[in-house]
Amino acid sequence: MNLKELLHNTKAKIYGKISSVEVRNLTRDSRNVGVGDIFIAKQGKHCDGNDFSHLAVENGAIAVASSIYNPFLPVVQIISSDLPRLEADLAAKYYGHPSQKLCVVGITGTNGKTTVSHLIKLLFDACDKPAGLIGTIEHILGNSRIQDGYTTPESCLLQKYLAKMVKSHLSAAVMEVSSIGLAVNRLANVDFDVGVLTNLTLDHLDFHSSFEEYKQAKLKLFSMLPSSGLAVVNNDLCDAAQFIEATQAQPITYGIEQHADYQASHVRFSPFGTDFDLLYKGETFACYSPLIGQHNIYNVLAAIAVTHQRLRCDLPHLISVIANVGAPRGRLEPIFSGPCPIYIDYAHTPDALDNVCQTLQALLPQDGRLIVVFGCGGDRDQSKRKIMAQVVEKYGFAVVTTDNPRGEDPEKIINEICSGFLKRNFSIEIDRKQAITYALSIASDRDIVLVAGKGHETYQIFKHQTIAFDDKEIVLGVLSSYV
């Protein structure tokens, strides 16, 4: 597509002479700009893209999109006060509105997005409707897999990834949809067919000014759904009705406690999986999932509801597939080769940590204890630090350590966490590797060790450096030294 075609009918102000030169790419990173690119000069939290516009032009940019006009740039400038929306508009048009050629499923909620998206993708694949995946752990775009650190990528990348799915002849795109992504318009011009709400608890209050603002961002996904779409909602949530009222799509509910279209009952837990009865339209189906914990029953129900309703696949077939699908990496991922069961989990919010601790405590023998290694991320919501300590204290012994401190002092974060403990039933070890080593050294064969907070991550972020760090690999390394 050439520049004149791309900018035709744009609502932005255009400065400079528009030619029919071909547009090669759209990017926010001036370091990646090449000849024929459009540079999106976004103002971020830590730097301003406008400071790099000259560099982008030197590298071959044919136009710069910004919220600020720069009279010294010798290229076309596309100026809008709503730059995120402009970026979304340009990206969708440039890549040919790829979401219109896919069944797009968006999953939002505080916890569970990764597991639900993982399950839905595999169920779609099993029903001969191959799906791509965009999420926290990775983006699967057909034969290619990308790890870029985004749960919901910026519009330029998001539309590019969707276009790759179309090119790979996929039928669907299953996406984790973050509240931040919704709030800053990254999802504009994505045509969703299905919206899923997993749950709603406190998170991202470092970005959103209040819980109500956080909830309103989540509601935005459901307001985007068409009347032909599906709104799949956890009916056990106190806010379920508000999400159903916010959409014109067909509501489909799932749950355990409240009556729902897809309801679980007679739940039986074990260390190796979960059995339950699935009730649907008066029929009862026996279900088994290798996933453990009540929170994962909700995840399984959501995935089955989406696939059954959207694809009209045979329900017994979906149940048989679920019986063979394990957890995504770093989501209650078990390691059974140690002195006791060890689990790696991404839980980094109070609610997620509570769910995981409750699940594992139920698996303990009467004289066993739960040992939890955890910390809190720096430059993130500080209000949850005390609460995380209070959660762990309910269930077992805490080993408080460093998570991703980012720009903060690790000791300061740990001190804020520890102020939440009421009893001295915890230990402090700033070095995360040493914390894991210590937890394993004090564990008996009657205990369970949970290493929480980082899950699938293979790095640790400090103020001046990011180092390689993988909780699972550290655990396996410590265990190998016992042999």
Curated annotation (Swiss-Prot):
Keywords on record: ATP-binding, Cell cycle, Cell division, Cell shape, Cell wall biogenesis/degradation, Cytoplasm, Ligase, Magnesium, Nucleotide-binding, Peptidoglycan synthesis
Cofactor(s) the record lists: Mg(2+)
Modified residues (N6-carboxylysine): 218
Signal peptide: none
Motif (Meso-diaminopimelate recognition motif): 403-406
InterPro entries: Mur-like_cat_sf, Mur_ligase_C, Mur_ligase_C_dom_sf, Mur_ligase_cen, Mur_ligase_N, MurE/MurF_N, UDP-N-AcMur-Glu-dNH2Pim_ligase
Biological or metabolic pathway of the protein: Cell wall biogenesis; peptidoglycan biosynthesis
Chain sites annotated for binding meso-2,6-diaminopimelate: 380, 403-406, 453, 457
Gene Ontology cellular component terms for the protein in this record: cytoplasm
Molecular-function annotations in GO: ATP binding; magnesium ion binding; UDP-N-acetylmuramoylalanyl-D-glutamate-2,6-diaminopimelate ligase activity
One Pfam family here: Mur_ligase_C
Record carries keyword Cytoplasm: yes
Post-translational modification: Carboxylation is probably crucial for Mg(2+) binding and, consequently, for the gamma-phosphate positioning of ATP.
Annotated binding of ATP, by residue: 109-115
Residues annotated as binding UDP-N-acetyl-alpha-D-muramoyl-L-alanyl-D-glutamate: 30, 151-152, 178, 186
EC number: 6.3.2.13
Entry's localization field: Cytoplasm
GO biological process: cell division; cell wall organization; peptidoglycan biosynthetic process; regulation of cell shape
The reaction(s) this protein catalyses: UDP-N-acetyl-alpha-D-muramoyl-L-alanyl-D-glutamate + meso-2,6-diaminopimelate + ATP = UDP-N-acetyl-alpha-D-muramoyl-L-alanyl-gamma-D-glutamyl-meso-2,6-diaminopimelate + ADP + phosphate + H(+)
NCBIfam families with a match to the protein in the record: murE (TIGR01085), PRK00139.1-4 (NF001126)
Role description: Catalyzes the addition of meso-diaminopimelic acid to the nucleotide precursor UDP-N-acetylmuramoyl-L-alanyl-D-glutamate (UMAG) in the biosynthesis of bacterial cell-wall peptidoglycan.
Record-stated family: Belongs to the MurCDEF family. MurE subfamily.
Name of the protein: UDP-N-acetylmuramoyl-L-alanyl-D-glutamate--2,6-diaminopimelate ligase
The organism's taxonomic lineage, starting at the top: Bacteria, Pseudomonadati, Chlamydiota, Chlamydiia, Chlamydiales
